């Protein structure tokens, strides 16, 4: 039977794979590169150590960022003046930009970005 840490690590790895599928849909070159990097990082830390829970947490945070904060764009034409089309999917985090409207005033941040 696998240890809890191994199960958590496999779960985090699966989260990264799912997040790369969502973030890099139809961009196979970047999708393959992201998955290879994830695999290399997990293989590098294959043995369980003191920092394993932190590494698992880091992997989950990476998956969350990939899923909610990465937007890809494709240029409509081949010239520099052509417009970019952004692929914004349902999981993308959308802000309201209220802090931009405040201007030069001090902005109080209620919570951390990762909260």
UniProtKB/Swiss-Prot annotation:
GO CC, alphabetical: mitochondrial matrix
Domain of life: Eukaryota
One BP term from GO: mitochondrial respiratory chain complex III assembly
Segment annotated as transit peptide: 1-36
InterPro entries in alphabetical order: Complex1_LYR_dom, Complex1_LYR_LYRM7, MZM1/LYRM7
CDD domains, alphabetized: Complex1_LYR_LYRM7
Keyword annotations: Chaperone, Mitochondrion, Transit peptide
Main location, first listed in the record: mitochondrion
GO molecular function term, any single one: protein folding chaperone
Localization: Mitochondrion matrix
Described purpose of this protein according to its UniProt entry: Assembly factor required for Rieske Fe-S protein RIP1 incorporation into the cytochrome b-c1 (CIII) complex. Functions as a chaperone, binding to this subunit within the mitochondrial matrix and stabilizing it prior to its translocation and insertion into the late CIII dimeric intermediate within the mitochondrial inner membrane. Modulates the mitochondrial matrix zinc pool.
Similarity annotation: Belongs to the complex I LYR family. MZM1 subfamily.
Subunit (UniProt): Interacts with RIP1.
Record protein name field: Mitochondrial zinc maintenance protein 1, mitochondrial
Organism: Aspergillus clavatus (strain ATCC 1007 / CBS 513.65 / DSM 816 / NCTC 3887 / NRRL 1 / QM 1276 / 107)
Lineage of origin: Eukaryota, Fungi, Dikarya, Ascomycota, Pezizomycotina
